[in-house]
Amino acid sequence: MIKKIYLAGGCFWGIEQYYNLNQKIISTNVGYLNSKIDNPTYKDVCNNITDAVEAVELTYDDQVISLNEIIDLLFKVIDPTSINKQGNDIGRQYRTGIYSRDSNELMAIQEKINELQNNYSKLIQTEVMLVDNYYLAEEYHQKYLEKNPNGYCHINLKAK
């Protein structure tokens, strides 16, 4: 079945490109998730007036790749114990999270996070929440690292 999941882990450019490099993923786009204001802009998000998180909407076929595999991949490139920071990206918009529009799916995600907690001495800070809203980011953010291969990325994509 074709499904969508929303992931956050620092700057959305890197997370999007990381999953775009995976042949099992159908498509991605980047946006602002769970904003307190309608139609936020990048400037709004950076000025801390939205409480939105930079996120990637990931479309996948659960017969090809499981949600648990997607979460395992995310945890390979984030520090889930860090609060509002990934690499050089600092701010609430850079928090880590896994978001769904399905409350039953949230329970499965939380179970997976509880299992992964055994691998960490510090508490996992990754949010697990329902999607309240999701606004596409500006076009120049979409597939940014494909358009700008030498652009900034907090993930070492060459090592992946």
UniProtKB/Swiss-Prot annotation:
Q: Which UniProt keywords apply?
A: Oxidoreductase
Tell me, what does this protein do in biology? Has an important function as a repair enzyme for proteins that have been inactivated by oxidation. Catalyzes the reversible oxidation-reduction of methionine sulfoxide in proteins to methionine.
| Top-level EC class as recorded in UniProt | oxidoreductase
A GO biological process of this protein is: protein modification process
- What residues form the catalytic site here? C11
Catalytic activity from the UniProt record: L-methionyl-[protein] + [thioredoxin]-disulfide + H2O = L-methionyl-(S)-S-oxide-[protein] + [thioredoxin]-dithiol; [thioredoxin]-disulfide + L-methionine + H2O = L-methionine (S)-S-oxide + [thioredoxin]-dithiol
**What NCBIfam families does UniProt report for this protein, alphabetically?**
msrA (TIGR00401)
Instruction: List GO terms (cellular component aspect).
Output: cytoplasm
E.C. no:
1.8.4.11
User: What is this protein identified as?
Assistant: Peptide methionine sulfoxide reductase MsrA
The record's listing under Pfam families reads: PMSR (PF01625)
Per the record, the similarity remark reads: Belongs to the MsrA Met sulfoxide reductase family.
- Any GO MF annotation of the entry: peptide-methionine (S)-S-oxide reductase activity
Query: Which PANTHER family does the UniProt entry name for this protein?
Result: MITOCHONDRIAL PEPTIDE METHIONINE SULFOXIDE REDUCTASE
Question: Mind telling me which SUPFAM superfamilies this protein's record contains?
Answer: Peptide methionine sulfoxide reductase
What InterPro entries does its record include?
Met_Sox_Rdtase_MsrA_dom, Met_Sox_Rdtase_MsrA_sf, MsrA_MetSO_reductase
